[in-house]
Amino acid sequence: MAKESYKRDKPHVNIGTIGHVDHGKTTLTAAITSVLAKQGLAAARDFGSIDKAPEERERGITISTAHVEYQTKKRHYAHIDCPGHADYIKNMITGAAQMDGAILVVAGTDGPMPQTREHILLARQVNVPSLVVFLNKVDIADPELIELVELELRELLTQYNFPGDDIPIVKGSALKALEGDPEGEKAIMELMDAVDSFIPDPVRDIDKPFLMPVEDVFSISGRGTVGTGRIERGRIKINEEVEIVGLRPTRKSVVTGIEMFQKLLDEGQAGDNAGLLLRGVDKTELERGMVIAKPGTIKPHTKFKAEVYILKKEEGGRHTPFFNGYRPQFYFRTTDVTGSVTLPEGVEMVMPGDNLGVEVELLAPIAMDEGLRFAIREGGRTVGAGSVTTIIE
C-alpha cells in the first residue's frame, strides 16, 4: 500500500489477538489481512511475516510484537499479535500496545485453556474495555463440542466481569479463510462486523481532561516558574486554572503562558512538548515527577494494588527471587519513588519471570488513576513492570 493512503477520515482503533498458544491467533491475523486485501482495505500479510515479530523495548523491557494495519468500511485498525505467551503478558502489563479492544481466539477443538483464562484475567486487570470471540478450527471440531465450548466461554467471560451473555462469538476457520475458502472468508467478514459494532470507539487523548507530567523546571526572571513536559492528554489554554499534584500537598495555579519551541502559543494539546508558565509558583515548589492537571481530575496516592511482571535474568532482570517487604523504586511517568511490596497470602517469594498481583505502598504520593503503568527499578536498572489495578489510599 502506498504511504500516503493513511487518512484520518475514519475512527482509529487499536486491537489485538489474544488467547492460548496454537489456537490460531497469528493465522487469524493473516486471514483478516488477506480477506480485507481482496476489498482493497489492507495489504495482505502472510503467517511468516507476522510470526517473525520484531523486538521492541518498552519501559526497559524487550517485547516481540507484530504490528499489522487494515481498514473496514467503518474504521481504521492497528492490530497487534505476539508470538509468545510471555510477550502477551509483558505487552499487556507494560501497555506497550494499549488495546481499545481485543479478539479472543479459542480453538473449538480444545475449548478454553489455561492461557485463555490468563489472557481474559489480564485484559480485565489492565482495562481492555471490550472483547469479541473468534471460535477457530470449527471445520475440524465436533459440532456438539462447539456448543459446549461456547457455553463454557460465556461463563468464563462473565466470571471475569465481561458481559458474557452479550459478547459476540463468531465461529469459523482462520486457515480455511487464508486458503480462500468462501465459507471461511464469510466468517472473517462476520468477525470484522462484530468488531466494528461491539468494540466502542475509544475516547481520544485530546478529549480527556488536561494532564502534563513535569520533566523539568526553570525560572524566568520577572515572569515566574516554567514546568516543561509532554502533554499526556487534553488541552490547555492561557489563563486556565490548573492543579499541581504529587510528591507534596496539591496546590492550584494559573497558566499565564504556553511555550513550544521558543514560540508563545494560545493553547497546547496532547502530544505537544510544552513549557507552562505558572502564576505564583516558586521554582522550589515544582519538581520533576509532579503533574500539572485540570483541577479535580487526578489525586495523589501512596497505596495501590498492581499486576506486575518481573524480568527474567536473561532479560536483564534480577538473578534472585525477592520476598515480602521488597523495596525497589517505582518509576511513574517521569520519576522514581521508593515503595515496599506486600505479596499475596500464601506467596512466599517471587521468581524472575513471574507475573502476579501485589500491593505497593510508596514513600511519597504520586498522581495516579487505575490503569497507570510503571516500571520497577533497582538503582536505575529496570527489573519489572506493572499496571495499577486498584487504588487503596
From Swiss-Prot:
This is Elongation factor Tu. The gene is tuf. Residues 173-175 are annotated as: G5. It holds the Pfam family GTP_EFTU. Residues 10-203 form the tr-type G domain. Residues 60-64 are annotated as: G2. The keyword Secreted does not apply. GO terms for molecular function: GTP binding; GTPase activity; translation elongation factor activity. It is found in: Cytoplasm. Monomer. Keywords: Cytoplasm, Elongation factor, GTP-binding, Hydrolase, Magnesium, Metal-binding, Nucleotide-binding, Protein biosynthesis. It catalyses: GTP + H2O = GDP + phosphate + H(+). It comes from Pelodictyon phaeoclathratiforme (strain DSM 5477 / BU-1).
